[in-house]
Amino acid sequence: MGTKMFTYLYKITVDIEELEGEALCALMDEVWEQVRSGSLKHLCIIIYTASQLQTLRTWLENHEEATGCVEWMMKAELAFNDRHGINEPATIIMNAEDIPAGNLPHAGNSSVSWIFRVHTEDELETVSSLIDRYELQHYKIEPVYDNTNLPFFEEQVFLEKEDIFSKPVSMQEIMRNQVLNTHKFGKLFVSSNGDVRAGSVLEAPIGNLHAENIRRLVHKEMTEGKSWLHIRNQKPCCDCIYQWLCPSPSDYESVIGRPNLCHIEE
């Protein structure tokens, strides 16, 4: 297996959890050593503390060739308190309930993208107003299921027939939906202990970085995996005329415990 396997690999997310100092650098060294010869587009690192952020900035200074694909992901509290400012590509995660009453730090920072997590209609309205107020361009609104807000999901996430036809669906998209999962394909998640998951953190590990190289794990997922190639080929979707027009199965189906998230019965 040569570097061809890396053509399928689009993004690696590394959750460094409680790692600090040398242990953190060792994990990053191992990940980067294995993917540097490929064409990885995104190496996303989930950061929890200011000391981790400083360690990673030093690590990146010593690995300039990684600059083009490395991006940070952190909660708003850490980002807002970063005394150095954010100059690297970064995604800030913010719960709707944590939106500051005053100005939104980094609102004008072109390096920053946003993930706003919402649980209710009111939170969705608050976030939408914030986006309009600051004219944010790079953002994602992420509904969070908490076992009590199914009506919110039924209203805002579940599909109607009109949603499917709200924009043109190309033949390429239809064919893609028949063979791969567009939400999960090409994505790996690496835990601080080296466990590697394909497509989602909810999936079982497909191996461990310290025991198997990433190229082999990509091959395993392509030939044996159940995440990247998870399509709508089960009931009731397999009996629906809109089977390949709908988006691929997502984590929401797994969390909510339903094979489909729609109001369509055809």
Report the location of each language-model feature:
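N-terminal pre-core extensions flanking Radical SAM catalytic domains
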Residues: 1-58
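A general structural motif
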Residues: 9-11, 38-42, 65-69, 87-89, ...
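Structural motif
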Residues: 14-20, 44-52, 70-78, 91-100, ...
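Acidic (Asp/Glu)-rich catalytic clusters
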Residues: 34-36, 58-65, 80-88, 101-109, ...
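Non-catalytic interaction/Regulatory regions outside core domains
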Residues: 96-101, 106-150, 257-266
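A C-terminal junction/extension of Radical SAM enzymes
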Residues: 128-199, 245
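Residue-level structural signal for beta-strand termini and adjacent loop
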Residues: 202-204
